[in-house]
Amino acid sequence: MDIRQDYPLSKRNTFGIAARTDWWIDYTCDADIDRLVKDEFFQDCRVQTIGEGSNLLFLANFHGILLHSEVKGITELHKDQDSILLRVGSGMVWDDFVAYAVENNYYGIENLSLIPGQVGASAVQNIGAYGVEVSQLIEAVHARHYRTGESRVFRNEDCRYAYRYSIFKEPDYAEWTIMYVDYRLRLKPSFSLEYKALAKVLEEERITPTLQSIRDTVIRIRNSKLPDPATIGNAGSFFVNPVVSAEKFNTLQTEYPSIPSYPQPDGSVKVPAGWLIEQCGYKGHRSGAVGVYEHQALVLVNYGGATGTQVGALAEEIIGNVRQKFGITLHPEVKYIL
């Protein structure tokens, strides 16, 4: 376990916000959690779990303890002719795990290449891209309650997964920190190519689908649309794509015939938040050190020196204008930390 005081966070969040935390703790195993449970100072402090800082926005310095997983490793639990069950440490970099799966011919997560963050965060956020959500592959989440020390295995159904949602986002589950995630990956060739943008590139460039070619293509597409946080601070998609009723969508389509849409199984319709933002004139918008990325309106950026409150203010401005124009309220996918 590694403990640091008055710790700078500019390199611990992909927005590059220059906040600080009173305390930063890296944990590597169950024994570290056991120590923290017995520590009176820790138990008296405000605690927030954090991964790679790729889906959050610091609005101010954090007064308390940021708890960060350094639990690593991949263990094979079971293998049959169709699938393999892997237990992965929550502190492993997500894209390193994707690369490992591709190298070992394990199918299922290749569409999720280059998504920033850790393995633990994948289970919290239910990350998704190009027609795949990680909840389709998660079998169980192993967690510890950092106040009581309780250990619990959350089966997939216990996590209540939905679009960009899991039970771990609820306040009642905020004190659970993830140790390991179990993923069941396929051993037989099987690809998810229903997503139009991905399928179009593969077809136009006559790319034969393989694990590596799909991973490479996804990485290329993502790099063409999203800025590198090492160069321009950002948290990827800032807003959740809104889901509206079929009736609401039909009304919008009458006024905006070119509006993109993704019909959902329950009859509702998902509308790209980036398209809504772009129609409000924000694509490429800049106000001082903050702005909207020129190649993807869903991405808010820090050009250097911006504060979290400045980014948040731009987000609220966008929310207001989208609501006024379309009657749709956007919700941040990024978590605000006060």
Swiss-Prot record:
Highest taxon of source: Bacteria
Query: Which pathway is this protein assigned to?
Result: Cell wall biogenesis; peptidoglycan biosynthesis
Give the top-level enzyme category: oxidoreductase
Q: Name one Pfam family in it.
A: MurB_C
Catalytic reaction annotation: UDP-N-acetyl-alpha-D-muramate + NADP(+) = UDP-N-acetyl-3-O-(1-carboxyvinyl)-alpha-D-glucosamine + NADPH + H(+)
Its localization reads: Cytoplasm
Q: Which cofactor does it need?
A: FAD
Q: Which residues form the FAD-binding PCMH-type domain?
A: 17-188
Primary localization class, coarse? cytoplasm
Q: Name one GO biological process term.
A: cell wall organization
In terms of InterPro entries, this protein maps to: FAD-bd_PCMH, FAD-bd_PCMH-like_sf, FAD-bd_PCMH_sub1, FAD-bd_PCMH_sub2, MurB, MurB_C, MurB_C_sf, Oxid_FAD_bind_N
Keyword terms, alphabetized: Cell cycle, Cell division, Cell shape, Cell wall biogenesis/degradation, Cytoplasm, FAD, Flavoprotein, NADP, Oxidoreductase, Peptidoglycan synthesis
**Enzyme Commission no:** 1.3.1.98
Positions annotated as active site in the UniProt record? R164, S237, E333
Q: Name one GO cellular component term.
A: cytosol
* Entry function: Cell wall formation.
Fetch the HAMAP family from UniProt.
Answer: MurB
Protein name according to UniProt? UDP-N-acetylenolpyruvoylglucosamine reductase
Species this protein is from? Porphyromonas gingivalis (strain ATCC BAA-308 / W83)
Taxonomy of the source species: Bacteria, Pseudomonadati, Bacteroidota, Bacteroidia, Bacteroidales
